[in-house]
């Protein structure tokens, strides 16, 4: 009799390319198939070589050169040998995806390695001409210096108009004229974090542009699982099902159902199960009944109301740490959300306490955009997120907001580790925004549509209900996904501005169409047309979500809010400068202090509103032994046993 492990998750893999689909439903499949150069320790998250593709990982004294010595006799499931050249080709693929116009917004995990903002800022051309070699050496040692002057000038030029709310009306015409005549500034160019990857004496040598505490940890995530390069197409997208070196291989994948069989070429301990079947059941009720009826052996995202009965019936219900973030992504290129006062108003309007009823015990309010498990101490952490409806209304008055429509995207007909019932959470959340006078229009999207749209550069998308589990043990595992849309915007803009003037096709032809976050660090005047359309909440996407959904209120007239002074905000360039400084620190303790500044800056700039640090539960049948939950919500099945 075959030993088959049957697992149900709440969302189908969008695709089976982990580099372009960095979501749990994809990773849960590829984790059984692909291996990475480094693996995170289960308890500490520290990168190590145990169970990885490497037998040795060496870092140079200056922390710029990382050498990966591969294990011998490792083969892909199709029999092809793993070589250093294979790994180099995978790095080249990640670079192409992170920097390409069509893929920059999707290849979020590879952004810190190759995309805009995380490497070393380049000097302007006129300065390069006169710079000597010693100055170049200084830039390498102090990677953030190059951005300092331009970042400071940017902050001074954009923050000052918002200091006095009474000047808002007087400056309307001048501001509008300035906005129509001010040219779009050329983005700062960056040397990527990874400057070179080459094969040397059978090893892989990676050279960085600056020291990075996160680099090794970044490589532990499934997005960097090594794939047979024979599957890389001309555009570097996969031409078929990924082939890896892990304990299993993908036999078939169709309509959210994936079948995996043991990899006959695997050089590790043979799994004690003969087959894995991963299916998709989008509601917790369906997963619950499939489990108790013996149709599946385990499932993700157990509803809190079912935990008691499952425990009484002898099922295992292991939980995960709340190493996650549920948040509202605020599109700084949107004509209304470009105004910093509107973004701050949303942060002060949200009622986080009302959302807890849809999450398991252990979920907590998120006051910042990073997990509290990093123990980063900040002054007044609630300053930018405390609920204060009066302040929210005053900030909207300061912005000149007048019922302009803001669309809010959220995933429908899906269940995710960070949100089991998106419709309920959306309805509860949006009610608090409507109460302060915001005109929110819901945009429910299928899982595939949501994944494609939530990070793409756009001036149409307003708010998005978003979330994730941290994929590696570093603060940038949280900051990176939150800032990904802005990084993708800058990356694509860099492609446009650096294209030859003679180019008449491709990215250069789309320059005028690019959305812009320019001015998002100030109280820039809202130019969008007010709308008579009222806010509303849609009907639940699923019948089972209809219970306990709070209806969105109709805004009621309130006394005219008084504009308030708007504190200056750091620019996005300054925030990235602070992130680079923290990531270049010599120790985790030093990094923690530097990231406290980043948290404060993000609280002022408010590119996203933190909502919750959510936990989730797994339910496992009595016949399954050895199931171990992981902090990043991606579990490995190769060591399971079935009785």
Where are these regions (language model features)?
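A bilobed periplasmic-binding-protein/Venus flytrap-type ligand-binding module shared by bacterial periplasmic
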Residues: 261-266, 320-345, 349, 358, ...
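Structural transition elements
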Residues: 364-399, 405, 413-424
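Aromatic- and charge-enriched surface segment that lines or borders ligand/interaction sites
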Residues: 56-119, 205
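N-terminal lobe/hinge region of extracytoplasmic solute-binding protein
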Residues: 8-61, 92, 243
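Gly/Pro-rich hinge or "lid" segments in bacterial periplasmic/extracellular proteins
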Residues: 135, 140-145, 153-190, 203, ...
């Amino acid at each position: 009799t075959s030993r088959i492990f049957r697992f149900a998750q709440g969302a189908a893999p969008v695709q089976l390319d982990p580099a372009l689909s960095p979501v749990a439903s994809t990773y849960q499949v590829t984790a059984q198939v692909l291996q990475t150069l480094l693996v995170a320790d289960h308890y500490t998250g520290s990168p190590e070589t145990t169970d990885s593709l490497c037998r040795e990982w060496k870092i140079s004294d200056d922390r710029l050169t990382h050498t990966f010595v591969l294990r011998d006799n490792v083969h892909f499931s199709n029999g092809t040998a793993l070589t250093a050249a294979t790994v180099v080709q995978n790095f080249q693929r990640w670079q192409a995806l992170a920097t390409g116009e069509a893929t920059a917004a999707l290849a979020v995990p590879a952004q810190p390695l190759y995309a805009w903002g995380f490497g070393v800022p380049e000097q302007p051309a006129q300065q390069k001409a006169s710079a000597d070699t010693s100055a170049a050496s200084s830039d390498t040692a102090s990677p953030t210096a190059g951005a300092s002057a331009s970042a400071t000038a940017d902050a001074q030029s954009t923050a000052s108009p918002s200091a006095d709310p009474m000047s808002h009306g007087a400056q309307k015409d001048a501001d509008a004229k300035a906005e129509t005549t001010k040219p779009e500034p050329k983005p700062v160019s960056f040397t990527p974090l990874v400057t070179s990857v080459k094969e040397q004496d059978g090893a892989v040598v990676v050279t960085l542009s600056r020291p990075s505490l996160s680099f090794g940890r970044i490589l532990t995530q499934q997005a960097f699982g090594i794939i047979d390069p024979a599957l890389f197409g001309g555009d570097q997208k996969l031409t078929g099902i990924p082939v890896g070196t892990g304990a299993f291989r993908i036999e078939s994948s169709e309509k959210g159902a994936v079948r995996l069989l043991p990899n006959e070429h695997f050089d590790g301990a043979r799994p004690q199960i003969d087959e894995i079947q991963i299916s998709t059941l989008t509601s917790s009720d369906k997963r619950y009944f499939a489990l108790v009826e013996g149709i599946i052996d385990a499932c993700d995202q157990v509803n809190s109301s079912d935990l008691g009965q499952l425990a009484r019936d002898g099922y295992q219900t292991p939980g995960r740490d709340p190493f996650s973030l549920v948040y509202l992504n605020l599109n700084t290129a949107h004509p209304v959300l470009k105004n910093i006062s509107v973004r701050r108003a949303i942060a002060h309007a949200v009622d986080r306490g009302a959302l807890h009823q849809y999450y398991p015990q252990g979920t907590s309010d998120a006051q910042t955009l990073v997990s509290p498990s990093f123990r980063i101490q900040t002054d007044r952490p609630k300053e930018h997120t405390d609920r204060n409806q009066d302040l929210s209304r005053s900030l909207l008055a300061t912005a000149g907001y007048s019922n302009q429509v803001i669309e809010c995207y959220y995933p429908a007909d899906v269940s995710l580790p960070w949100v089991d019932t998106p419709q309920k959470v959306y309805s509860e959340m949006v009610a608090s925004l409507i109460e302060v006078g915001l005109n929110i229009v819901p945009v429910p999207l299928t899982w595939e549509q949501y994944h494609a749209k939530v990070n793409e550069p756009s001036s149409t998308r307003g708010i998005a209900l978003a979330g994730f589990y941290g994929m590696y043990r570093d603060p940038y595992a949280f900051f990176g996904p939150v800032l990904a849309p802005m990084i993708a915007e800058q990356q694509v803009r860099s492609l446009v501005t650096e294209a030859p003037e003679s180019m008449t096709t491709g990215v250069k032809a789309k320059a005028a169409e690019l959305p812009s976050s320019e001015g998002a660090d100030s109280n820039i005047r809202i130019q969008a047309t007010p709308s008579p359309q009222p806010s509303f909440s849609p009907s639940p996407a699923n019948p089972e979500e209809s219970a306990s959904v709070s209806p969105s209120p109709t805004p009621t007239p309130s006394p005219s809010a008084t504009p308030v002074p708007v504190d200056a905000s750091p620019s996005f360039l300054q925030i990235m400068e602070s992130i680079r400084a923290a990531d270049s620190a010599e120790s985790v303790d030093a990094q923690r202090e530097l990231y406290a500044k980043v948290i404060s800056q993000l609280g002022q700039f408010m590119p996203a509103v933190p909502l919750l640090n959510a936990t989730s539960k797994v339910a496992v049948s009595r016949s399954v032994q050895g199931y171990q939950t992981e902090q990043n919500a991606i579990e490995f099945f190769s060591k399971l046993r079935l009785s």
